[in-house]
Amino acid sequence: MITKRKKKSYTSVYALGQYISMSAHKARRVIDQIRGRSYEEALMILELMPYRGCYPIFKLVYSAAANASHNKGFKETNLVISKAEVNQGNTVKKLKPRARGRSYPIKRSTCHITIVLEDISFYQQYEEYLMYLKKPGCSNENRNLTCYDTYSSGGLWDKK
């Protein structure tokens, strides 16, 4: 069996909630609203939405931000929800006793939720550095790279 080794990411932090007693469809309805938004905006959205699934997702987003600030020293204002996924978990099966000695099955569905936060300040610093390199006054030795085109150089296309 081939297993992939996870690459260590320097800009992302995640929080994983397993066996949350809610169906995956109901959790996805909430997750789709916050995917791609900033951390603070996602917290405001989750506080104001009227769904029962908002509270465990709110706790997960808050936990992921706490992981980011404690483990990697990121600021909460620079965090963005880059990836949020909901997977179906186990189904807890019970029996409900009914009249005349009968019983009805009850299925409680669970789900696993993963929230990944990324620090966008790293990308902003990288873009600023690229803009600095593109300035005309910048003395960079590798800046005068030329792109050779096979059509204009007449290399292979002259011969038939």
Swiss-Prot record:
GO molecular-function term, one example from the UniProt record: structural constituent of ribosome
Family matches, as Pfam families: Ribosomal_L22
GO BP terms: translation
Record keywords: Chloroplast, Plastid, Ribonucleoprotein, Ribosomal protein, RNA-binding, rRNA-binding
Subcellular location: Plastid, Chloroplast
Primary location: plastid
Alphabetical list of InterPro entries matching this protein: Ribosomal_uL22, Ribosomal_uL22_bac/chlpt-type, Ribosomal_uL22_bac/org-type, Ribosomal_uL22_CS, Ribosomal_uL22_sf
The keyword Transmembrane helix is assigned to this record: no
One GO CC term on file: large ribosomal subunit
Matching HAMAP family: Ribosomal_uL22_B
PANTHER family for the chain: CHLOROPLAST 50S RIBOSOMAL PROTEIN L22-RELATED (PTHR13501), LARGE RIBOSOMAL SUBUNIT PROTEIN UL22M (PTHR13501:SF10)
Protein's job: This protein binds specifically to 23S rRNA.
Subunit structure: Part of the 50S ribosomal subunit.
Family from the record: Belongs to the universal ribosomal protein uL22 family.
Protein name from the UniProt record: Large ribosomal subunit protein uL22c
Gene behind the chain: rpl22
